[in-house]
Structures are given as C-alpha cells and as structure tokens.
Amino acid sequence: NGEIYNYQELRKELIEAGHVFVSNTDSETLIHGYEQWGEKLVDRLRGMYAFVIWDTKKKRLFGARDIFGIKPFYYAQMNQTFLFASEIKAFMEHPKFDKIFNEDALGNYLSFQFVPTNETFFKGVFCLQPGHYFIYEDGKMEISRYFEPNFTGKYEKTFDEAAAEVEKVMKESVEKHKISDVEVASYLSSGVDSSYLTYLGQVDHTFTVGFDEGEYSEIQDAKDFAESIHMKNDAKVITPDEYWDSLSDIQYYMDEPVADPAAVALYFLSKEAAKKVKVVLSGEGSDELFGGYNIYCEPLEHTAFNKIPMPI
C-alpha cells in the first residue's frame, strides 16, 4: 500500500546491477530491491508505504512501514496464526481472530487523547511503528527500527536562512508528491499550511468544506485564495444533521476511537474530492512539525512543578 517516490532512480540502479524488470511499477522495484539489498532496502526508500515480501528462499516474511507512519500496518499473533492488514476490521473476517477489548489502550486514550504505544483497542492487535521493519520466521517476529530523526540541538542559521531552507525542501517534496498518472488536486482551508501547499503544488482543482455556521466556516476565505491564484474551488457546507449522521460511518472507517473532531470535516472533504480525483495534497502534519497546537506548550508550562520541594 502506498507510493515509492524515488522508485525510478532505484530501478535504474538495479537495472545497472543486472536486474531484469517486466513492468514499470514501484511494487516490482521493491522486490528487486529486496533481492539486491535485503533489509537495507528500507534505507533507500522515499515515500509513503506499508508492504510485505515473502522470501521463498529463506522462508520468512519481511515487512516495513514508512518513516512518518502515513500508511497503516496492523498485525496480530493468535491461535498459531500470524495476521497482518492495513485495517483492523480486516481481521474480523478471519476465523482465528479473537475480538477482545483492550482496557490498557483505553487508559492511555483518556489520558493523552490517543494511544502513544503500539497497542490498539483490540487485545493482541498491534501497529507496526513508523520507521520500523520486521522479519517473521519460524513463528517468531523480530522488529527493528531503521529510522530515527537526529536533532543536534545546535542551529546557528538566521530566521531568513531557515525560512529559505524550509521553502526549498517544501518545493522539492511537493514536486515528488505530484508524480502521478492521474490529476493531483489539493485540500484547501483558510490556514497557512494548506494554502501554502496548494500554491506550491500549482494544482488545477481545490476542495473545501465548512459548517452551517458563519464563524466556523472557512469556505469564503478559501474561495478567495483559490481565485487569487487562478484555481478552481469546490466547496461543501456540512449541515448539523449531516454531521451527526456521519459519525457511525466515520467510526467504522477509523477502526478505533479518534479524539479529533476535525476527522468529520476531513471525512466529508475526502468524500467530495473522491467524486472527481484520486490524489490530493493535504496540509496534515504541519502543526505537528512546527508546534501549532497549544498542547505542545504544556511541558514548558509545567516546568515550575519541577521545583516543588520534596516531602520530608
């Protein structure tokens, strides 16, 4: 599941090494890459992916997930059976799967509004963490981390230099993400993140949703921005009835509880976009990278408690 954005470069390197391809797909590139480099293949990949390869020679299963965890990967070992899927609901169809509620995940969810470990709300079902790969052999699963961000803590560039570097990286990344056989569109709100990506992407089509309350709708701002850069904008207003009626469907698709009310808007946004396109750019992730939420300030606010005297 996913897309390998640098597969053409890898394919060229593998052909030079003697590999013979029968297609021009990133999936086949993964197979030849594993044959050439083994587990080290993941160090060369750029993209969003979750995949497995059955090694017929070594009789083992190799699988990996991208460094940001964009593509999901779930697994379970129960009743002498190893299960894996992109969605937890897929396990429900298997006769060896035991559907048992995981109370430990509930405690984490109520404390942090998400589950910070690899556990899920189903006992025995785990998610492969971002930037990890696994080898399943002789009934045993060994998981390894292949990517870890490196923050030195030293940064001596000026604000303007940093901004220029971010822009350079963003432009290059968006260009990679636009490699597609079909039209690429963009989600658009009035926020800086989606507006910036939309501008960089130079797409023809944008999609926006808003609520049936003026103060909670960004439709007009999004339309004005799209018009200013000569892009088409499709907008949908979500009514209160549509909001409440959609919750059961959203929960079904999410598999687990999600403490983000924006999931409703994203559901309708995706539903509208899917009527016309298959690929969209999204501003998801910018707040996490640049500390855009108040919750990221909480550790600093609580530092004063470190100085409270210990009891005698």
Place the predicted regions along the sequence by residue.
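Cysteine-centered catalytic environments shared across enzyme families
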Residues: 1-254, 266, 270
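Active-site adenylate/phosphate-handling loop in enzymes that bind or generate adenylated species
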Residues: 67, 268-312
